[in-house]
Amino acid sequence: PNGPGSIQYSNGSQFSGSFKDGLKFNQGTYTFRDGTTARFQFLNDVPNGEGIINYKNGDVYQGSFKDGRRNGSGEIVFSDGFKFSGEFVDDVPNGNGVVVYLDQSKFSGFYKNGIREGKGSIISNEIKFDVNFKDDNFNGSGILIQGSNTFKNHYINGLRDGLSHHQYSDNSVFSGNYQKNEKHGEGVYIYP
């Protein structure tokens, strides 16, 4: 068939949209048995182009599809208000991405296979934190600015580990070592 039409599936889901040579083509909408709805652009029976999915739980994805999967730029707004926008490869965040949390703080950085990897920044009303990530944890150097205080730390698996340098708003300074987030070994405080 060619032109508009619909399909009722045995599992209770339904498709309505355009067909060309018997294949889904151009615009079409799925209504799934669980209440999830999806509107896609189709090419050769498969979602390719822009689309939007309204999940049963209230989450919404809007963005690009290729070969039936989220590929390219997209945004997910979760039912609790948490939001991710960025690049997807085969349904998984890969590339640059931005997360906006409920308190409106933001993470911006790079994702690899769905986890934070490489340079990233966390910004809120109170802090700015530039840090390296590995396997979704702080790893490597990081600089945290909180008001007039600056904290330069080295991290291993999310914990301060190694040389740290802290400069406080009263111009006092701490330099010393941390191990597993605890001060360890020698350190120096300098008071103004």
PLM regions with names:
Residues 9, 30-32, 55, 78, ...:
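Position-specific recognition of the canonical hydrophobic site in helix A of tetratricopeptide repeat
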